[in-house]
Curated annotation (Swiss-Prot):
GO cellular component: cytoplasm
Keywords of this entry: Cytoplasm, Methyltransferase, S-adenosyl-L-methionine, Transferase, tRNA processing
CDD domains given in the database record: AdoMet_MTases
Functional summary from the UniProt entry: Specifically methylates the adenine in position 37 of tRNA(1)(Val) (anticodon cmo5UAC).
Originating species: Cronobacter sakazakii (strain ATCC BAA-894) (Enterobacter sakazakii)
Top-level taxon in the UniProt lineage: Bacteria
Gene Ontology terms: biological process: tRNA processing
Name of this chain's protein: tRNA1(Val) (adenine(37)-N6)-methyltransferase
């Protein structure tokens, strides 16, 4: 007799190896974070930092992708989100090598003496606009509490010379962010432009910067093909995570 299927929990997102509750987080699990967590280069990373960790999604994805010797830090300003990230991480297979810090990244950066081979962030990207329903969501969406210049400066203090700082942004914000990064001494090394459907213009961009100069590798990613199914490239990128892929 076949066993009944385990019902999916409804207060978050179930992945193949972990669950992310996000009901106490301003920004929910979404494609942007999943793209960045699956895309960021982890090959040489021994220490990983997630700035603005929210529910802990990126931290958990990168923990799954890295060896057991790799340690990860997740920094989140909002206390409720940081607590939920701790709960998600404690319930995961990688709790022993992850630390969550409820802190302002500028203050936290000044207290650090070690550097990271990989830093990731799914940062706020809207200028101040229409008021959000809650202060926490406004903090997560708008650059008023963490502008891009400050984010880049903090990452510069924490990155190793050969390390990578990776972000996901709207396509419309990518060029301005890259210019600002260049002004602060960063070098763009990886860029992937992401389109939702065949025939559509890119709507997101994945960027990896390094303090060290070098060739920039650029490519494109299509999320869905003409049949509206996930494209082979998107499946290859994310199949280790999506439950039904």
């Amino acid at each position: 007799m076949s066993q009944p299927k385990t019902p999916l929990r409804r207060n978050g997102f179930t992945f193949k190896q972990f669950f992310v509750a996000h009901d106490r987080c301003a920004m929910k699990v979404g494609t942007d974070g999943i793209l960045l967590g699956a895309w960021a280069p982890v090959a040489k990373a021994q220490r990983v930092l997630d700035i603005g960790a929210g529910s802990g999604l990126l931290t958990l994805m990168l923990a799954q992708r890295t060896e057991d010797t790799v340690t990860l830090d997740a920094v989140e300003l909002d206390a409720q989100a940081a607590e939920q990230a701790r709960e998600n991480i404690d319930a995961s297979p990688w709790a022993a090598r992850i630390q969550v810090h409820s802190a302002d990244i500028q203050t936290w950066t000044q207290q650090q003496t070690q550097r990271y081979e990989l830093i990731v962030s799914n940062p706020p990207y809207y200028d101040k606009g229409v008021a959000c329903a809650t202060p926490a969501r406004e903090q997560a969406r708008y650059t008023t509490t963490l502008d891009h210049g400050t984010l880049l400066a903090c990452a510069a203090q924490l990155i190793t010379e050969e390390g990578f700082f990776c972000v996901v942004l709207p396509e419309s914000s990518g060029e301005a962010f890259s210019r600002l990064a260049g002004e602060q001494g960063w070098h763009l090394r990886l860029r992937t432009d992401v389109a939702e459907n065949a025939g559509k213009l890119p709507h997101r961009v994945l960027l990896a910067f390094s303090p060290s100069p070098g060739e920039c590798f650029c490519d494109d990613l299509l999320i869905r093909g003409p049949d509206q199914h996930y494209s082979p490239a998107y499946c290859a990128l994310t199949e280790a995570f999506y439950l039904f892929m």
